[in-house]
Amino acid sequence: MSQQLTYSSKINKIRTFALILVFAGIITMYGGILTKNIEWLMVIFFILGTLMVILSCAVYVWIGTLSLRAVPVICPSCEKPTKMLGRVDACMHCKQPLTMDKNLEGIEFDEKYNSRKYKKK
């Protein structure tokens, strides 16, 4: 039984991280409401929750600027427009590995191809 590897695009990974931060911040602040009898603990929960939500906003702004600089391409598998960050990425829709580097065509997909160490080789 062969294992099918599933890749996801970098933009979607970062957006998912920011969304998790929003929900984690809200849940943390809800924990502050549950501990309202212990005032100092409630304040800590609210501050941590607020910082998480603010950090998620910063991540969303950052990924928005990255998304504007990403190269738009048409996926050869699903023929939908997607964006690529780096030398290798995955389609946002069908998870198909993509590359714009002719040297990497036909080679097994690996995210290490985006690292600076690999580019120097």
UniProtKB/Swiss-Prot annotation:
Keyword list, A-Z: Cell membrane, Membrane, Transmembrane, Transmembrane helix
InterPro entries noted in UniProt: UPF0295 (IPR020912)
Mode of membrane association: Multi-pass membrane protein
Entry annotated with the keyword Membrane: yes
Main location: membrane
Annotated TM spans: 14-34, 43-63
Location of the protein in the cell: Cell membrane
Residue stretches in coiled coil: none
Family that this chain belongs to: Belongs to the UPF0295 family.
Protein name, as recorded: UPF0295 protein OB0906
